[in-house]
Amino acid sequence: MSVPAFIDITEEDQAAELRAYLKSKGAEISEENSEGGLHVDLAQIIEVCDVCLKEDDKDVESVMNSVVSLLLILEPDKQEALIESLCEKLVKFREGERPSLRLQLLSNLFHGMDKNTPVRYTVYCSLLKVASSCGAIQYIPTELDQVRKWISDWNLSTDKKHTLLRLLYDVLVDCKKSDTAAKVMVELLGSYTEDNASQARVDAHRCIVRALKDPNTFLFDHLLALKPVKFLEGELIHDLLTIFVSAKLVSYVKFYQNNKDFIDSLGLLHEQNMAKMRLLTFMGMAVENKEISFDTMQQELQIGADDVEAFVIDAVKTKMVYCKIDQTQRKVVVSHSTHRTFGKQQWQQLYDTLNTWKQNLNQVKNSLLSLSDT
């Protein structure tokens, strides 16, 4: 069957065409337009529009784009409820069927709206949900700078801002974008104030667990500065985070022995925690010592003599530590190690290093000038 193109006709005729088409597909809708006006027609059309989603993609996109075009010409105060209704239909249709089509329709709606229209928030959230259901987050703009701009442009309330960032975080995690997800969660937690930080307990808890679980995350000190995380001080989750921030392996082992059920309840695997704490402990040792004996490593990291070389190789692969093995003297020679924490002492060290470089460059400059004068 040929589907009407819905162009070059009045809005009223377009609505009537849509009504007739939907009724022909089995929808319970009158073919006559409502006396209440276009927004009432659209409300009734959107209510039953999912019947046409059974058709082939080309036909559906034509019909649904017609609905979108009519939505976009409505006054802003009449758009919001209708757009929310349409988004709900597209998100929930048949438990995730035809995601690419629904993504395209939502994208057409999103990009067809004025950039500062607040209801774009609803459409963007719907895009994220559909993208998550089919692992297609790469087709949705998720850059944090862009999301920040939208939050400002749409003048979102605090609750909506938190809802958006929380949803974005969940979607990124589901789609295996752990690095980006971590940045979004830090953004979310950083948006709380002293007054409402207590409301972010669940988010802060999830943030800590996700960071500890992530095999590619090794630095955690920035989390301690977040107000919602500070609110957890005195709780086991905060104690555990503090261990991963600056303590040694022996401290984690003691914590685990006393709180095994708690670790298990978080969904954290003890052996993975041990592996990460061994690396973190080694990083701390490498910052303080340029040479570390095998015996010291065996004792501090609780590993056997035969495991030292394999451990060092794995540590170097993380790029958190740069070192080489001296088999003859049974030691590890460190060239560089990332600091687990970066506070006043580290800033002073950086200042001293840069100042030394500056002085050396001045000496080179003066030497070159003296040579040019001779």
Curated annotation (Swiss-Prot):
Keyword Mitochondrion set for record: no
One Pfam family from the record: PCI
Domain (PCI) ranges: 180-339
InterPro entries: ARM-type_fold (IPR016024), COPS7/eIF3m (IPR045237), eIF3m (IPR027528), eIF3m_C_helix (IPR040750), PCI_dom (IPR000717), WH_DNA-bd_sf (IPR036390)
Chief localisation class: cytoplasm
Assigned GO CC terms: eukaryotic 43S preinitiation complex; eukaryotic 48S preinitiation complex; eukaryotic translation initiation factor 3 complex; eukaryotic translation initiation factor 3 complex, eIF3m
Single biological process term from Gene Ontology: formation of cytoplasmic translation initiation complex
GO molecular function: translation initiation factor activity; translation initiation factor binding
Name this polypeptide is given: Eukaryotic translation initiation factor 3 subunit M
Keywords: Cytoplasm, Initiation factor, Protein biosynthesis
